[in-house]
Amino acid sequence: MSTERGLKDSIAGTVAGAACLFTGHPFDTIRVRLQTSNTPIGIMECFRNTIKYEGFSGLYKGVTSPLFGMMFETAVLFAGYGQMKVLLQKDENTPLTVGQCAIAGGFAGVGASVVLTPVELVKCRLQVQTTGPQKYKGSLDCLVQILKEGGIRGAYRGFTPTIAREFVGNMAFFSTYETCKRYFKNKENKPNDDDELNLPALIISGGLGGMAYWTVLYPVDVAKSKIQISEGAGPSPSIVKVLKEIYSKEGVKGLFRGYTPTIIRSFPANAAMFSVYELVIKLLG
């Protein structure tokens, strides 16, 4: 992959990450609160309580943490995906199979996890702060306190489930996206890889890719959220231990707590991300 193409992927990924974040963050706040609540609570009740006690801004709690982090993470993700596709491609005239796209997406997700873990850690800690005394004054204060309590290791609390989610999730994410794109290109008689799709096709492809990403390994994300809001300087509880505890208390339903707002969020957020990504790539030439 040329340096120029890599730079374009990074720039487009950065802008796409911001679009995804602002579109989906309110739903993400509800997701994290449902996942980490000590008592079962409905989506609408959680939404109403947030608006009632914290105002509309409560839905955007923790948004400053992932803003620059997610922009950087999506830049790494798309640049990594582009690089992996080049490594897997036999020659320029042979398109990648969907399976190869899945592998490229999975390994790109592993790289993005390095950026994503501390960003999501801070975001989750801030999102579960509701009314009453606030331990963290903001994103920077939260990160500083985490580093004081646990050092770099503390900042990477939840790293293992994040890698698992990002590897498997991005395999599903990019393979679904590429499958949908190829379907629409065949339907519109646009066989070449460089042929542009219309906006509705990009929205559907990106939205379905996002839904696949969250569905394929959702219980691991629930465990990740639980692990990341747990505090202390000691080692994090294992994914298996957390999943067993959730299952013993709430059954299968507990493993999918917050799934509905996640899926509702995933379609518009990822539709926005891929549409903006493709638009920026087009503008950059």
UniProtKB/Swiss-Prot annotation:
GO terms for biological process: mitochondrial L-ornithine transmembrane transport. InterPro entries: Mitochondrial_Carrier, Mitochondrial_sb/sol_carrier, Mt_carrier_dom_sf. It comes from Dictyostelium discoideum (Social amoeba). One of its GO terms (molecular function) is L-ornithine transmembrane transporter activity. Solcar repeats lie at residues 4-87, 96-183, 197-283. Mitochondrial solute carriers shuttle metabolites, nucleotides, and cofactors through the mitochondrial inner membrane. Mediates the transport of acylcarnitines of different length across the mitochondrial inner membrane from the cytosol to the mitochondrial matrix for their oxidation by the mitochondrial fatty acid-oxidation pathway. This is Mitochondrial substrate carrier family protein S. GO terms for cellular component: mitochondrial inner membrane; mitochondrion. Residues 1-9, 83-101, 173-199, 278-285 are mitochondrial intermembrane.
